[in-house]
A protein has these predicted regions:
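Cytosolic catalytic domains that perform sulfur/thiol-centered chemistry
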Residues: 1-487
């Protein structure tokens, strides 16, 4: 198929470009993008004129039809308004992708399903047609992009220059030594945050020493990834299994320090393996540099401390301190950590959800463990009053989950965002000076009562979109050893 060759749909199911454009705001129409999530976010996977998606589209990659079970498919379809009685339009790169989902929808009783047979490339080629995309999509890279880079190519949205790839985790060099992506160096989060200071970011002098020892300058393009593995939240160091969250923690601190271009591999190690790309076992040592190039921190606004968190709380109209924690943590049933005793929440915060426990982020990821479609994330935040016009700081227990959500806000182009570094660990240690609440907040209790639904310890009624995935890929690794010192 040539670049602009239309996808051929049946005449009775085809929808024209003009009609589709005229119906972009039709509340009775669900437009479904079945391309890979990277394309939806903004990557030009087929070299099209523009990247992104048709405004108002919901993402349902065709790969989900074979990667998750039938019950999960039904839930994902329903959560996106792809249900019987709705009008649905499908579009993609490949006619086979559309045909497969069209057949599945027919089996689910959807009769009003039409195909945008001109295809995405035709839409993208017309500058008069609107396109939406993730504002900073290029900071969330996909496996093919990284493969091209490692093979010496010039992938899209990369201007050349020096780059480094890091396998990130919390104190498990054995995982890196078992195997890792070709050319990757090892990065222990303990080199960037301090276990002796409740895992807050290290001092500017320590960060300067750490990044220089890793060969990083402010102008180095840094790509990070992690490996999510099976484990028990009650084991001594469960954070060692949350590789992708660890990678976003490293990313946030590197951006705070002053690295201009830091990117995350969406899906991490698992997606590289799924693509069939090679791994290596060679332990690579970094080449230190003499100077980082700028003073640290260059972006102090990206990570804030307790006084700034209190200032944000004092400005309820123009700011939001967002709790990226489970509902049980939020209402004080559990602390979420085996090393944090007190349970509860920061008084005046806004609940932002996370996943099943302190080491999972399913609420922010898809069923295949990549970033959840950003319109869903932003819509959920908006329902809670978390909007880009406000000063928003995210917190969790020690900054990891907060870093992942901070990164998603950064990808969406939000500018006044931060991680409250000390989080619940710091706040809960001084309840006399730091107000704490437990129980269901009054506004959420009212929403529950108004809905007429029970609230059996889970998130309050009315949460938008898909909840925790039940099929995120997992692999097994060793338990690891004690944290290593800064190199």
């Amino acid at each position: 198929m040539t670049l602009l060759e239309p996808i051929q749909g049946r005449p009775d199911t085809a929808i024209s470009t003009a009609e589709l454009r005229s119906r972009l705001d039709d509340p009775d129409l669900t437009i479904v993008d079945v391309r890979p999530m990277a394309a939806f976010n903004g990557w030009r996977l087929r070299g099209e004129a523009r990247g992104g998606h048709i405004p108002g589209s919901v993402a349902f990659p065709s790969a989900w039809l074979t990667s998750v079970d039938e019950a999960e498919i039904e839930r994902q379809l329903a959560d996106r308004g792809i249900v019987a009685g709705r009008s649905v339009v499908l579009y993609a790169y490949d006619p086979a992708e559309v045909a497969e989902l069209e057949a599945r929808l027919a089996a689910h009783g959807l009769t009003d399903v039409r195909i945008f047979d001109a295809g995405w490339e035709s839409w993208a080629a017309d500058p008069d047609l609107p396109v939406d995309r993730l504002a900073n999509f290029d900071k969330l890279v996909h496996t093919e992009w990284l493969r091209q880079l490692l093979d010496g190519g010039q992938p899209d949205a990369f201007d050349g220059g020096r780059f480094l790839l890091f396998h990130v985790n919390f104190g498990v060099p054995e995982e890196y030594e078992e195997n890792h992506l070709p050319g990757a160096l090892y990065l222990d989060t303990n080199w960037l945050e301090d276990p002796e200071n409740i895992w807050q970011r290290r001092s500017p002098a320590e960060l300067d020493r750490a990044v220089r020892s890793l060969g990083i300058t402010s102008d180095t393009t840094v790509i990070v990834y992690g490996r999510d593995t099976e484990g028990d939240a009650n084991e001594k160091w469960p954070g060692r299994r949350a590789g992708q969250i660890a990678a976003t923690r490293a990313l946030a601190i590197l951006r705070y320090a002053g690295v201009k271009d830091v990117r995350l591999l969406d899906g991490g190690y698992d997606w590289w393996v799924r693509a069939g790309y090679p791994l290596e076992t060679v332990r690579r040592e970094p080449t230190p540099v003499e100077s980082f190039g700028v003073s640290i921190p260059q972006r102090p606004d990206y990570i804030v401390d307790i006084d700034e968190a209190k200032s944000i709380l004092a400005d309820q109209a123009g700011s939001a301190l967002v709790s990226v924690r489970t509902w049980k943590e939020h209402i004080g049933k559990v602390s979420g950590y085996n090393y944090i005793g007190p349970a509860g929440r920061i008084a005046g915060d806004v609940w932002g959800n996370c996943g099943t426990d302190a080491y999972h982020m399913q609420h922010y990821r898809t069923v295949d463990n990549t970033m959840r479609p950003y319109p869903e994330i932003v819509a959920n935040w908006a329902e809670a009053g978390i909007t880009p016009d406000k000063r928003v700081a995210f917190y969790c227990g020690t900054g990891w989950r907060a870093s992942e959500t901070w990164f998603y806000a950064y990808l969406a182009g939000w500018e006044r965002i931060a991680v409250y570094d000390g989080g619940w660990f710091e706040w809960s240690r001084d309840p006399l000076n730091n107000p704490i609440e437990v129980g269901v907040p009054q506004d959420e209790f009212a929403a529950q009562a108004g809905s007429g639904q029970a609230h059996p310890g889970g998130p309050p009624p009315g949460a938008r979109g898909p909840g925790p995935s039940r099929t995120a890929p997992r692999t097994r690794t060793s338990a690891g050893t004690a944290p290593r010192p800064i190199p």
